[in-house]
């Protein structure tokens, strides 16, 4: 009798995606982050659901409701901090996942890559709106500053901002709609993640060598399910350590002050995972130019497949490209540091140089390195 997992319509989908899936035999721990992102997403949806049961999206009670969750709800503080720090873990996994894609040439699966870029934008939008919900000082002013950027759009900008706000400033209407969007978007992310996997399974996974591995595939289960479980355990350990020992390490102390439209915090800045983009934003003196640079800093990923000049897929055997890749990583860390600093000398000039270097590496140096490496190998 044929096994039910191979015949039942629903079980068959799960079987072909997670059990009998032919997988390259040589993929490394860098391929763990896809499943870790799935774990993070489920964790965020579950903790978010329980938080939403106690949260009120009204400007007068939002801050108090978060305090109530932490003080009065049974283990509410755990749920709240797992959700807040879970977002940080989500972004760490995201950056690792995208970095892996860049390093090993996974971006040549263009449909998978493009859905991934849409996912990245959606996750960033969700995280931004989630940061507004506790209605602390940084929530309010972060929302004001970031939504105000849309006013740089010629002609329709001001109307667009007021339309998003639901009034003439960030207020009750803004908070209510942000809560609604923050609730619905993770389910859209879940659907997009399924599409992401659908496209990936059309081609099969890439591998570190960048060479087609059709001749050497192994079943996903048990070989990679066990590795994914180990990865999930390590992620859980890291998250639990963060939540139980220093839950506010990655947050901003200003967000423990209730939102006050009459008092501006000394340094308005987003969460740490947006600081690199924030640094690029304020490294350009012109408002519209800054907004375009901000959007393009992520959208540039869509150009990467078009700028691939090497005849090899990944960077495993390309030392010149490897140097540029790690320079890019160092540059992004520099931008992250700059984004958290006050807008004054010498941070402005460092941010401008780091921003120029970021775009130069991706748009100019990496394609040139690919051509040089081809010539060195007489290809």
Swiss-Prot record:
A ubiquinone binds at residue 201. PROSITE patterns: CYTB_CTER (PS51003), CYTB_NTER (PS51002). The keyword Transmembrane helix applies. Keywords: Electron transport, Heme, Iron, Membrane, Metal-binding, Mitochondrion, Mitochondrion inner membrane, Respiratory chain, Transmembrane, Transmembrane helix, Transport, Ubiquinone. GO terms for cellular component: mitochondrial inner membrane; respiratory chain complex III. Heme b b566 binds at residues 97, 196. It is a multi-pass membrane protein. Pfam families: Cytochrom_B_C (PF00032), Cytochrome_B (PF00033). Its cofactor is heme b. Heme b b562 binds at residues 83, 182. The chain crosses the membrane at residues 33-53, 77-98, 113-133, 178-198, 226-246, 288-308, 320-340, 347-367. One of its GO terms (biological process) is mitochondrial electron transport, ubiquinol to cytochrome c. Belongs to the cytochrome b family. PANTHER family: CYTOCHROME B. Component of the ubiquinol-cytochrome c reductase complex (complex III or cytochrome b-c1 complex) that is part of the mitochondrial respiratory chain. The b-c1 complex mediates electron transfer from ubiquinol to cytochrome c. Contributes to the generation of a proton gradient across the mitochondrial membrane that is then used for ATP synthesis. The cytochrome bc1 complex contains 11 subunits: 3 respiratory subunits (MT-CYB, CYC1 and UQCRFS1), 2 core proteins (UQCRC1 and UQCRC2) and 6 low-molecular weight proteins (UQCRH/QCR6, UQCRB/QCR7, UQCRQ/QCR8, UQCR10/QCR9, UQCR11/QCR10 and a cleavage product of UQCRFS1). This cytochrome bc1 complex then forms a dimer. Heme 1 (or BL or b562) is low-potential and absorbs at about 562 nm, and heme 2 (or BH or b566) is high-potential and absorbs at about 566 nm. This is Cytochrome b. It comes from Ursus maritimus.
């Amino acid at each position: 009798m044929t096994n039910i997992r191979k015949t039942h319509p629903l079980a068959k989908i799960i079987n072909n995606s997670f059990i009998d899936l032919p997988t390259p035999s040589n993929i490394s721990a860098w391929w763990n982050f896809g499943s870790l992102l799935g774990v993070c997403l489920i964790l965020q949806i579950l903790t978010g659901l329980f938080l939403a049961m106690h949260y009120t999206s009204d400007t007068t009670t939002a801050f108090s409701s978060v305090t109530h969750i932490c003080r009065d709800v049974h283990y509410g503080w755990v749920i709240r901090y797992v959700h807040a720090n879970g977002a940080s873990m989500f972004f760490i996994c995201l950056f690792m996942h995208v970095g892996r894609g860049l390093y090993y040439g996974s971006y040549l699966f263009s449909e998978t890559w493009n859905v991934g870029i849409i996912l990245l934008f959606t996750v960033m939008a969700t995280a931004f709106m989630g940061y507004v919900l506790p209605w602390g000082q940084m929530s309010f002013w972060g929302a004001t500053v970031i939504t105000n950027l849309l006013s740089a759009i010629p002609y329709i900008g001001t109307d667009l901002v007021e339309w998003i706000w639901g009034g003439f400033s960030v207020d009750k209407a803004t908070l209510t709609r942000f809560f609604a969007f923050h609730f619905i978007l993770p389910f859209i992310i879940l659907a997009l993640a399924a599409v992401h996997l659908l496209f990936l399974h059309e081609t099969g996974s890439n591998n570190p060598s960048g060479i087609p591995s059709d001749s050497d595939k192994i079943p996903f289960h048990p070989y990679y399910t066990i590795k994914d479980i180990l990865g999930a355990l390590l992620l859980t350990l890291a998250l639990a350590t963060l939540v139980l020992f220093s839950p506010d390490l990655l947050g901003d102390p200003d967000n423990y002050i209730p939102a006050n439209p009459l008092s501006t915090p000394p340094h308005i800045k987003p969460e740490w995972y947006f600081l690199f983009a924030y640094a690029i934003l304020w490294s350009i003196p012109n408002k519209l130019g800054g907004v375009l640079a901000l959007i393009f800093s992520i959208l540039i990923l869509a150009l990467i497949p078009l700028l691939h000049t090497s005849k090899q897929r990944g960077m495993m055997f390309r030392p010149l490209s490897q140097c540029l890749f790690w320079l890019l990583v160092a540059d992004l860390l520099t931008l992250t540091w700059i984004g958290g600093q006050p807008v004054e000398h010498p941070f402005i000039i460092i941010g401008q140089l780091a921003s120029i270097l970021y775009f130069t590496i991706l748009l100019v140096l990496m394609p040139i390195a690919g051509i040089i490496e081809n010539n060195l190998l007489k290809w």
